[in-house]
């Protein structure tokens, strides 16, 4: 098992809010790692996702606040990804520009990407290992 992974918003939201088997599986995968890495945009995506789940009735306000507090306690190394723009441009034909940031970072670091978005793996565009938890 690698000591570091890049984690995307979908997997992290699952880890923070899902009390079922999929959430447990992500938390289990992340346990014992030396480090988590992500593009700097993760902060914005997490807040947007959690508040969106409140608006959609999938989380209570209290659960969202707890999720943000739990997120803030995680040791995540945030990376600027503008330097990866050329790879992001290549990837954006197959995945969203947001997802391309995570893929390009995982490729640059030579570590797996942990996600709950199977479309990233199905795209076949990534040159890194993709671990899907859904």
Task: Tell me what each language-model feature is.
Residues 1-42, 53-62, 118:
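Short, well-structured N-terminal submotif of metal-dependent ribonuclease cores
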Residues 14-16, 49, 123-124:
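Residues that scaffold the ATP/ADP-binding catalytic core of kinase and kinase-like folds
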Residues 41, 47-75, 87:
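Active-site-proximal, substrate-binding regions of enzyme catalytic domains
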């Amino acid at each position: 098992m690698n000591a570091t992974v890049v984690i995307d918003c979908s997997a992290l939201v699952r880890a923070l809010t899902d009390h079922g088997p999929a959430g447990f599986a992500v938390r289990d995968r992340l346990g014992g790692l030396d480090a988590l890495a992500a593009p700097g945009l993760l902060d914005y995506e997490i807040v947007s996702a959690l508040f969106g789940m409140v608006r959609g009735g999938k989380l209570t306000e209290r659960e969202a606040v707890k999720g943000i507090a739990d997120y803030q306690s995680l040791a995540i190394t945030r990376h600027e990804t503008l330097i990866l723009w050329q790879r992001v441009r290549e990837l954006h034909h197959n995945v969203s520009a947001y997802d391309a940031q995570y893929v390009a970072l995982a490729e640059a670091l030579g570590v797996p990407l942990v996600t709950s978005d199977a479309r990233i793996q199905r795209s076949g565009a990534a040159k890194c290992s993709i671990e899907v938890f859904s």
